[in-house]
From Swiss-Prot:
Identification of the protein by name: Secretoglobin family 1D member
Function per UniProt: May bind androgens and other steroids. May be under transcriptional regulation of steroid hormones.
Keywords noted in UniProt: Glycoprotein, Secreted, Signal
CDD domains: Secretoglobin
Coiled-coil regions, chain positions: none
Gene it is expressed from: SCGB1D
Listed Pfam families: Uteroglobin
Alphabetical list of PANTHER family matching this protein: SECRETOGLOBIN FAMILY 1D (PTHR11332), SECRETOGLOBIN FAMILY 1D MEMBER 4 (PTHR11332:SF6)
Subcellular location: Secreted
Organism field: Bos taurus
Main location: secreted
Positions of glycan attachment: N87
PROSITE patterns for the chain: SCGB
A GO CC term attached to the entry: extracellular space
Keyword Glycoprotein: yes
Length: 102
């Protein structure tokens, strides 16, 4: 449960920072891969970021914890994160289209 709260807080921090940028589709795809890809495929997916080995190892360690979540709980978490990402994107697009309302 603590990990899902952490993931939620990270997502909120990324969505509601001052720049008002639209949420990167790669971030949304990475969240899905994190929760549903097997370890080997996810490790290959992380290669696109050219992250240091220590960062990849840390991410994989967290993934091993989330892999123990039931499929039902993973669906609940990704559904909530999807709603947050959608809300962030809609809010950011409104700010871009009408800056005086921000």
């Amino acid at each position: 449960m603590r990990l899902s709260v952490t993931a939620l807080l990270v997502t909120l921090a990324l969505c509601y920072y001052e720049a008002n940028a639209i949420v990167c589709p790669t971030f949304a795809a990475d969240l899905t891969e994190f929760f549903y890809f097997p370890d080997l495929l996810y490790r290959l997916s992380l290669a696109k970021y050219n992250a240091p080995p220590e960062a990849v190892a840390a991410k994989m360690e967290v993934k091993q914890c989330t892999d123990r979540f039931s499929v039902k709980n993973r669906l609940i978490i990704t559904n909530i994160l999807g709603k947050i990402l959608l809300n962030c994107t809609v809010t950011d697009v409104k700010a871009v289209l009408n800056p005086s309302s921000a």
